[in-house]
Amino acid sequence: MAISRAQLLKELLPGLNALFGMEYQRYGEEHKEIYETESSERSFEEETKLSGFGSAPVKGEGSAIAYDNAQEAWTARYNHETIALGFSLTEEAVEDNLYDTLSARYTKALARAMSYTKQVKAANVLNNGFDGTNYPGGDAKALFATDHPLVNGGTNSNTQSTAADLNETSLENAVIQLAGWTDERGLLIAAKPRKLIIPPALQFVATRLLETDLRVGTADNDINALRTNGAIPEGYAVNHFLTDTDAYFLTTDVPNGMKHFERTALTTSMDGDFDTGNVRYKARERYSFGWSDPLGMWGSPGA
């Protein structure tokens, strides 16, 4: 349906002092704090996790050397979505508007809508990250699970066994937990946290935990071990599209974790209808958000 003069009555008459409602600031590309972006030339992308070798055994004198097998563990798949939105203006609405260029105003609103949608979709991977039934990964588990299966029969956990709110103890335990992660054959992988990702409600807690020299909540003169050790070297980032006010997450240095594939970059176009004189504008892009290795992220839903 085209935007006509009926929707723009005040803009057809003199005496209007201001038009407002589309000048709000918008949050930036917050997904870049979480995801690695790659381009894609297919309708979907797949990434397969490989299993290497176990620890080497002792070879006895004169005995045969032991041989091990490598294999594929599982495959993660990214299905790109097409995101598109448009609007149409009648010829008369454009002609009779007394105040500004309608197309310029509403193309800005279109860009705002497309940007907002991308940030919501990016954050929803974390928002739904504890739901393995509806949002499983390549290993058939939720992004955050206590039992990511390994080829050797063991498991890795990238969440808490008992959910806890963000505090000094829970954050220190998360750092310790990462140090115990192994590969598919049980070899330690030296994983470390990089950045704390939080909703707006936890920004002041995060500042006290990561940016003070001394421990918080105590009269003792103890140092802030998280800060002194550089345990979370990139500090924290607020994501305004997280829906759980007490959930918090850590990005890690494990490669091939959280990924954003860009199939088609954002494009805009317009055309005119000869019969009606209406002008149509649209924006369109194709992308996907997801994860390959779940160890690229650690998360807690909070208590």
Which positions does each model-derived feature cover?
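N-terminal alpha-helical "arm" segments
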Residues: M1-Y27
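Assembly/oligomerization interface modules of large self-assembling protein complexes
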Residues: M22-I83
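A generic local secondary-structure boundary/capping motif
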Residues: T75, E184-G186
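Long, contiguous amphipathic alpha-helices that act as assembly "spine/axial" helices in icosahedral shell
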Residues: A76-G132, L196, Y281-A283
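Internal, conserved structured core segments that host functional sites
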Residues: V125-D147
